[in-house]
Amino acid sequence: MTTTWWELQILCDPSLEETIFWRLDDFGCRGMAGEQKGQSYLIRAYSPQAEFDHLDLAALALLLKQDAVLAHLPKPVVKWHLIDEEDWSSSWKSHWQPEEIGDRLLIYPAWLEVPTHSERLLLRLDPGSAFGTGAHQTTQLCLEALEMRLGQQPETQVIADIGCGSGILSIGSLLLGAKQTFGVDTDILAVTASNSNRALNNIEPERMVVAQGSIDTLPKMYPEPFDGIVCNILAEIIIELIPKMSAIAKPDTWGILSGILIEQIQPIADTLEQNGWAIAALWKKDEWCCFNIRRN
Ligand SMILES: C[S@@+](CC[C@H](N)C(=O)[O-])C[C@H]1O[C@@H](n2cnc3c(N)ncnc32)[C@H](O)[C@@H]1O
């Protein structure tokens, strides 16, 4: 059965890009792409018709406009129309290009022919309807932090990936040499996407294990403590997860947390401190940041 999709087109001030991106993700959009259009920025986002009606989309448009007013920026122009499955995949895919991240990785859309030679590690990806194309600052911050963390003796590292989405951080860790990853996501579509991206990158199933669930699911998948934890979810959710992280960690476990806006640094830092974690480094990209943490 084919799905009909809403295509939302949002023409906005470029500085609203990140806020809109997260609003759309929170709303449940699957697949988003953005491009510069003169002085403005055009975001396209897609979601199955069956999940939303006109009223939902009108409410979303109102929220986006309110965000702009609060930020003292011009209101975005929001339009939507229906497209069929074929147009959805070709439209979205044509807007997503290979992207170099850090010094070693190249994110490579699954539908492009693989180059015969690449200086970089090719991370092939078809996120389907899951979050994680590598285009978002928070994913990039996590991949760059992983590159640093896995610089020495990566082959000993077993990593927990909480909120794995498309599986991008698990696959990135394994390409950088990690021993094994265990990913969880509350969204079953993310589990499906992670598994097909694992296969796309020729990674053995036992090296990259994925299940539907959250942090409490991880000990059932791997009963030992993890060497590293990556988690790129919204700050409000991370605050709920931090008190549970010690249960899956050992004294020298490291963590990489993102999905955090700069103004949310303090509550995250306080929660980490209260739960026995120290901040080793804090990296920023635009208004997003990424905590590199270790046990106290
Ligand atoms: C921002 S995406 C990150 C995807 C990918 N790891 C990346 O870095 O691009 C966050 C993911 O976390 C999942 N998620 C949200 N709340 C969660 C929770 N409490 N436990 C596990 N996963 C969760 C969402 O379904 C989504 O796939």
From Swiss-Prot:
Which key words tag this protein in UniProt?
A: Cytoplasm, Methyltransferase, S-adenosyl-L-methionine, Transferase
Tell me the GO BP annotations in alphabetical order: methylation
Q: Where does it mainly reside?
A: cytoplasm
HAMAP family in UniProt? Methyltr_PrmA
Location of this chain's protein in the cell:
Cytoplasm
Enzyme Commission number(s) of this protein = 2.1.1.-
Matches recorded under Pfam families: PrmA
Q: Which gene name does the record give? A: prmA
GO MF entries: protein-lysine N-methyltransferase activity
Record flagged with keyword Metal-binding: no
Q: What does this protein do?
A: Methylates ribosomal protein L11.
Q: Which residues bind S-adenosyl-L-methionine?
A: 139, 163, 185, 232
What family is this protein classified in? Answer: Belongs to the methyltransferase superfamily. PrmA family.
Q: Which InterPro entries match?
A: Ribosomal_L11_MeTrfase_PrmA (IPR050078), Ribosomal_PrmA_MeTrfase (IPR004498), SAM-dependent_MTases_sf (IPR029063)
GO CC annotations, alphabetized: cytoplasm
* Protein name stated in the entry: Ribosomal protein L11 methyltransferase
- Describe the reaction catalysed, as an equation: L-lysyl-[protein] + 3 S-adenosyl-L-methionine = N(6),N(6),N(6)-trimethyl-L-lysyl-[protein] + 3 S-adenosyl-L-homocysteine + 3 H(+)
